[in-house]
């Protein structure tokens, strides 16, 4: 019954972290099972030794009693054979009773444990002990591994396989858990392969005319890329519009009698006049620069100069002023010079200290602080 209980015992696998405890328990159980098996084997060996002693005694009695008849020897042999048969029958009954209590799972494990390795061992033992049949049977019985040993070996192999398989499985799980990117802030990897659209343009639609801005049109700007010159030429008509507008504003200012409207018209006339004057001054500066560059290039080509001379801002301003006065008439030039003289005089007077400013009335009131004279406001 001990063998059936051991075979019916089921093995329960524990988690990996409890393997050491489980292995210790299984080792203790295996030691207890080995002790039980050793005890059973010792009992069998004692029985066999007793039988051997009995046979020896019977043989001694036969050798000592030479006068006994052949019938007594036959009877003793028959009795010994009957004893052997009875012992074999009792052992077979015990084995049958124990096997009847073994579960199908234990039988399947025992059958699986008897693999080709065990069969090769049995064949080798049969071939080596073919001389003596009885001794051969005893040696086979002694050399054949017990089902419990095979089950223990099978369990050990399963544990080792489980330990070896758990490491790659854990690594695979870790690899599967790893994200596709190194970090969540890293850019995502996207395949460049995209499905081609099945739509095909058989007939091209007519081209739609797009609006063009003449300021950025290459036809207006010219091939040389001189943007300012092209724009000035393209929008030269605006200067004529501004001149006509100034003329209309002056006529309206002469006809109107409303003071508020006159103030508005006066402000508009001043703004338009300043805009036209600024445009004219810029145009005059460009002309002066163009003439100077042309003159310098000509001198370099003639060999009179090796390096060009670039005008300073003060010299450019003087040449622009000379050109302005040359383009005026005699009366306009006189009036312009008078206005400029007054302007320069006022500017110099402002820069002078109060004590040096010329006043007609020397008895003008001074400040209470004891400083210079007070500045008179012009009406």
Swiss-Prot record:
It is found in: Nucleus, Nucleolus. Keywords: Coiled coil, Nucleus, Ribonucleoprotein, Ribosome biogenesis, rRNA processing. The keyword Nucleus applies. One of its GO terms (biological process) is maturation of SSU-rRNA from tricistronic rRNA transcript (SSU-rRNA, 5.8S rRNA, LSU-rRNA). It comes from the Eukaryota. Residues 242-300 form a coiled coil. Residues 1-98, 113-231, 329-379 are annotated as: Disordered. Residues 117-126 have a biased composition (Basic residues). Residues 63-94 have a biased composition (Acidic residues). InterPro entries: RRP36. The keyword Cell membrane does not apply. One of its GO terms (cellular component) is 90S preribosome. Belongs to the RRP36 family. Associates with 90S and pre-40S pre-ribosomal particles. PANTHER family: RIBOSOMAL RNA PROCESSING PROTEIN 36 HOMOLOG. This is rRNA biogenesis protein rrp36. It comes from Aspergillus clavatus (strain ATCC 1007 / CBS 513.65 / DSM 816 / NCTC 3887 / NRRL 1 / QM 1276 / 107).
């Amino acid at each position: 019954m001990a063998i059936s209980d051991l075979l019916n015992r089921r093995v329960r696998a524990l988690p990996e972290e409890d393997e050491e405890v489980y292995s210790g328990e299984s080792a203790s159980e295996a030691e207890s099972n080995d002790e039980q098996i050793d005890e059973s084997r010792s009992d069998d060996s004692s029985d066999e030794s007793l039988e051997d002693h009995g046979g020896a005694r019977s043989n001694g009695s036969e050798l000592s009693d030479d006068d006994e008849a052949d019938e007594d020897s036959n009877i003793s042999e028959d009795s010994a054979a009957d004893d052997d048969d009875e012992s074999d029958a009792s052992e077979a009954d015990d084995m049958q009773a124990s096997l009847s209590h073994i579960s199908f799972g234990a039988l399947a494990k025992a059958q699986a444990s008897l693999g080709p390795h065990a069969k090769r061992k049995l064949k080798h033992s049969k071939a080596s002990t073919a001389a003596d049949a009885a001794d051969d049977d005893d040696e086979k019985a002694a050399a054949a591994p017990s089902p419990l040993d095979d089950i223990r070996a099978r369990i050990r192999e399963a544990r080792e396989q489980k330990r070896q398989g758990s490491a790659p499985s854990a690594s695979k799980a870790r690899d599967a858990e790893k994200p596709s990117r190194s970090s969540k802030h890293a850019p995502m990897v996207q395949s460049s392969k995209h499905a081609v659209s099945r739509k095909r343009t058989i007939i091209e639609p007519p081209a739609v005319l797009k609006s063009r801005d003449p300021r950025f049109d290459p036809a207006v700007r010219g091939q040389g890329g001189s943007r300012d010159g092209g724009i000035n030429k393209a929008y030269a008509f605006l200067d004529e519009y501004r001149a006509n507008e100034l003329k209309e504003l002056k006529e309206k200012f002469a006809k109107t009698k409303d003071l508020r409207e006159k103030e508005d018209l006066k402000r508009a006339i001043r703004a338009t006049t300043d805009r036209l004057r600024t445009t004219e001054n810029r145009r005059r500066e460009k002309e002066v620069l163009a003439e100077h560059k042309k003159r310098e290039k000509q001198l370099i080509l003639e060999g009179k100069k090796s390096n060009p001379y670039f005008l300073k801002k003060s010299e450019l301003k003087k040449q622009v002023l000379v050109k302005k006065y040359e383009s005026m008439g005699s009366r306009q030039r006189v009036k312009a010079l008078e206005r400029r003289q007054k302007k320069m005089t006022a500017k110099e007077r402002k820069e002078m200290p109060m004590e040096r400013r010329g006043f007609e009335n020397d008895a003008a009131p001074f400040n209470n602080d004891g400083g210079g004279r007070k500045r008179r406001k012009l009406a």
